[in-house]
Amino acid sequence: MSLSSLLWAFWYILPAYFANASPVLVGGGRPIDGGRYWKDGRRVFGDGKTWRGLIGGVAIGTAVGALQYFITPEFYGSLGKALLLAFLLSFGALFGDLVGSFFKRRIDLPRGSPAIGLDQLGFLISALAFAYPVKTLDSGQIIFLLVVSPFVHWGANYFAYKMGWKSVPW
């Protein structure tokens, strides 16, 4: 696996990274679950998953993809494909995060509690799955992202914590 191939994998996943990080800045407002409870008596997702965070995160991730297209059009082939891929990566990332929150509520982890693995990789796996029909990575690139993403996630969260955007560093 060449360094170039690994860098392209990182370039590919940037919309998902930005989408996953954005809700802490643009979120708030009405919770996606509308305050509803699941059969187990716990919130479906909790107050931390909002429509503004979801829509804003997808919009920011998609905008990152558009910017990427103008920097490296050969990577995508067309603006339409770039926007579609960025949208799928962004929505997939936030869908994976939402699924993670659902499972965290089921095991009674409160909002903001860390779930090692789920927090760092759930968004990535979901983003890759959503984007699969449009553009895929090879197995080496996927393994690279599975290894590097937890460190990117932890670093981004620590940065957001130090900036005062998050109340916890995870």
Curated annotation (Swiss-Prot):
Disulfide partners: none
GO terms of molecular function: CDP-2,3-bis-(O-geranylgeranyl)-sn-glycerol synthase activity
Reactions accelerated catalytically: 2,3-bis-O-(geranylgeranyl)-sn-glycerol 1-phosphate + CTP + H(+) = CDP-2,3-bis-O-(geranylgeranyl)-sn-glycerol + diphosphate
Domain of life: Archaea
Gene Ontology cellular component annotations, sorted alphabetically: plasma membrane
Pathway entry: Membrane lipid metabolism; glycerophospholipid metabolism
Pfam families hit by this protein: CarS-like
NAD is among the record's keywords: no
Membrane topology value: Multi-pass membrane protein
InterPro entries membership: CarS, CarS_archaea
Keyword Disulfide bond: no
Keyword tags: Cell membrane, Lipid biosynthesis, Lipid metabolism, Magnesium, Membrane, Phospholipid biosynthesis, Phospholipid metabolism, Transferase, Transmembrane, Transmembrane helix
Transmembrane segments: 6-26, 53-73, 83-103, 114-134, 140-160
Cofactors, names only: Mg(2+)
Compartments where found: Cell membrane
Main location: membrane
One Gene Ontology term from the biological process aspect of the record: glycerophospholipid biosynthetic process
Documented EC number(s): 2.7.7.67
Protein family: Belongs to the CDP-archaeol synthase family.
Main function: Catalyzes the formation of CDP-2,3-bis-(O-geranylgeranyl)-sn-glycerol (CDP-archaeol) from 2,3-bis-(O-geranylgeranyl)-sn-glycerol 1-phosphate (DGGGP) and CTP. This reaction is the third ether-bond-formation step in the biosynthesis of archaeal membrane lipids.
Protein name: CDP-archaeol synthase
Organism name: Thermococcus onnurineus (strain NA1)
Gene: carS
